[in-house]
UniProtKB/Swiss-Prot annotation:
Belongs to the conotoxin A superfamily. Keywords: Acetylcholine receptor inhibiting toxin, Amidation, Disulfide bond, Ion channel impairing toxin, Neurotoxin, Postsynaptic neurotoxin, Secreted, Toxin. It is found in: Secreted. The cysteine framework is I (CC-C-C). Alpha3/5 pattern. The keyword Metal-binding does not apply. The lineage of its organism: Eukaryota, Metazoa, Spiralia, Lophotrochozoa, Mollusca. This is Alpha-conotoxin SIA.
Length: 13
């Protein structure tokens, strides 16, 4: 998963 703003649409915490 991606837990930081730079992930954009992939943000998933």
């Amino acid at each position: 998963y991606c837990c930081h703003p730079a992930c954009g649409k992939n943000f998933d915490c």
